Amino acid sequence: MDKEKFQQKAVKQTKQKKSTSAEFLMVKEYTDATEGAGNPGFNMSSPELPAHQTPQEKVVRHDMLDHTLATHQQKSRLPASAGPKGVTSVLIVLTLAALLIRPGCPEREPGIPLKRACTASVEDLFGARVGGDAAEDLCTHWVQVTHSFVGEGYERMNSLFFGRLR
């Protein structure tokens, strides 16, 4: 058993020696190819360097951490809180709520349930057949969002938007 292990190790060591020498030769060939041994225009250390090419020192000097792709991607990411805020959000939400509430709906009184007072015409807006409950839920959601954005001034905004629809 020990003899077999010893032979296997010996075979592995000879393979490793061959592969390292082969890798050394491949690296040498690669550096010759990249340096452009046959073409002085591609050889950076050549005295026949064309005028439009810059020496390698200048290229390395300008290669700073800020110019890497990863740093650029990190800087270009928006903060987590980015998005429409303030008046823009209020106007978007109110416009969508105005579209979802049918112009013929009566003004919502405090005693009237929300689902009975506002029924959305989703078929007209999106061209899809949606049941009454889904339309009412959608309308309810947008009215609640509008209430959360506008707060106390909702009734004034309600008459401003929905008064024009009639």
UniProtKB/Swiss-Prot annotation:
Name of protein: Orofacial cleft 1 candidate gene 1 protein homolog
Organism the protein comes from: Mus musculus (Mouse)
GO cellular component: cytoplasm; cytosol; endoplasmic reticulum; microtubule cytoskeleton; perinuclear region of cytoplasm
Region of interest (Disordered), residue spans: 1-22
Annotated PANTHER family: OROFACIAL CLEFT 1 CANDIDATE GENE 1 PROTEIN
InterPro entries, sorted: OFCC1
